[in-house]
Amino acid sequence: MIIMIPIYAITWNFRDTPEGFDKIVNNDYNYFESLCKKSSIDEFVILITCNRVEIYAYTRNEIDKDLFKDSLIYNYPESTMHLLRVASGLESMSIGENDIMRQVKEAYELSIKRKTSGKILSYIFKKALNVGKEVRTQTSISRGKTSIPAISLDICDNEYGINNKSILIIGNGKMATDFSRYLKEYRPGNVTIAGRSIDHARNLAVLYGYSYDSIKNLNNLIKNSDIIIAATSAGNYIVKDLGDLARNKYFIDISKPENIDPEISKYARLLSINEIGKILKRNEDEKKGEVEIAEVIINQEQKTIDEKLKEMMLDDVIAMFYKFANNVKKDELEELFLIQDFNDEQKKDIDAMTSSLINKILAPYTNSVKQFIKENKNFDYILNEYKKMLEQFMENIVKKL
């Protein structure tokens, strides 16, 4: 049984919304956080990677779709299914990539730090991380090199060699960061990060003990490098018109659109994103069986999520009973203590007795209501109607008080 719960996945990604993704990808976290606040979203987690920008939202308010132009919006249960697939590496450009697990975890941890996620999204993200781990444990979907930078460097090392080579990384974003990290295992010579922002280039270079420079000095940097890696979000050729300067060098361009003019392949080896894409497609075909096993795991876990969310929704409604009863108790006791004189010990005993009385009176009733709603095939409709009825009842009582 599918239940309706206001959990959404708002996504711009390389596969489903490529044009929208290209428009939105250069915005930072604060930009997307401001969109969520403008739309009055109750809980949200923002995931930003090289190939996707996604907002997972739980809200009782209607989402302002005009704020999230060119995106694809999933409703529940497709929203949580999408997150499970993302965490498992099934939605990655390179099927089974491991980096996405770290990125999902970091996105969730940042939401906790910024206090934008609550009970609902915390449960779902913890579940997604567990599912991602289980998929990788129960299948071979993440075997071998799985990320685009890792695959690119592996090809480069086999064809050209990386050890002791002088390397230039053009860009300082997420993909450039991944290249910087993976390069360490190949023991390169000098590595230089070149970016439009010298401050951003410096920040990345310092993390790994590399050099940094401005992209304004590009031709000179290329002249002094053996391997040139382009990993930016620029929509044009950054590396072009090199002529003989390109000879005996190795170029890697994982940017889309391309950052390196294909004409360079006349003078040097150019490993392009299109060539890497063919390798990724071959890997995807080889992993079809593992994907099917992963989908079985995901579908089973989605059923568990359905049941748990039903429990959480029911608990919220039942909590309304007790909150209302305790508010009435508080008002009545305050009035009682004003007209009669009780010492502190007596007040404490009366408060405990009335709390116990509330629990004993409400428990059988609320438990039977909870069981009735849970077992009814029209769970969602009955729960919502019951909640509206309860809210109206409380509102009327408060007016009388």
Swiss-Prot record:
Q: What's the protein here called?
A: Glutamyl-tRNA reductase
InterPro entries recorded:
4pyrrol_synth_GluRdtase, 4pyrrol_synth_GluRdtase_dimer, 4pyrrol_synth_GluRdtase_N, GluRdtase_CS, GluRdtase_dimer_dom_sf, GluRdtase_N_sf, NAD(P)-bd_dom_sf, Shikm_DH/Glu-tRNA_Rdtase
Keywords linked to the UniProt accession: NADP, Oxidoreductase, Porphyrin biosynthesis
Q: Which organism is it from?
A: Picrophilus torridus (strain ATCC 700027 / DSM 9790 / JCM 10055 / NBRC 100828 / KAW 2/3)
Q: Describe its function.
A: Catalyzes the NADPH-dependent reduction of glutamyl-tRNA(Glu) to glutamate 1-semialdehyde (GSA).
Subunit text: Homodimer.
> Where are the catalytic residues?
50 (nucleophile)
Q: What extra comment accompanies this record?
A: During catalysis, the active site Cys acts as a nucleophile attacking the alpha-carbonyl group of tRNA-bound glutamate with the formation of a thioester intermediate between enzyme and glutamate, and the concomitant release of tRNA(Glu). The thioester intermediate is finally reduced by direct hydride transfer from NADPH, to form the product GSA.
Q: What is its EC number?
A: 1.2.1.70
